[in-house]
Amino acid sequence: MHLKVQKKYQFMYRFISWNVNGLRAVAGKGFADIFTELDADFFCLQETKLQAGQIDLEFLGYKSYWNYAEKKGYSGTAIYTKHEPLSVTYGIGVDEHDHEGRVVTLEMEDFYLVCVYVPNS
């Protein structure tokens, strides 16, 4: 698969949001190639369904921030970024929900980036 990507302005950011519905399955099916070709500034991933240490997906020039669900094989979010955030917040500050790994927020200089995975119902 070849994707043609063209940046029009240097000061613009490229954001990608992708519900991967299980990152382990996607990782073996060209995920790294797509990731590299899209060359986004920020990749937000939802429904990663991973626990800490289950997979090692690092990309040159990117730092990653993961929010894992306590329950195995359930929800989870991650953000890969080329830019250093001012701060990172995991969850929404509600203990009842924060164990599900549904939210990662990056505070950037000019904006907040919130990666969210919400239930269907």
Per-region residue spans from a language model:
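N-terminal, active-site-proximal structural segment of metallo-dependent hydrolase catalytic domains
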Residues: 2-59, 69, 74
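Structured beta-strand-rich core segments of catalytic domains in phosphoester-bond hydrolases
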Residues: 49, 55-121
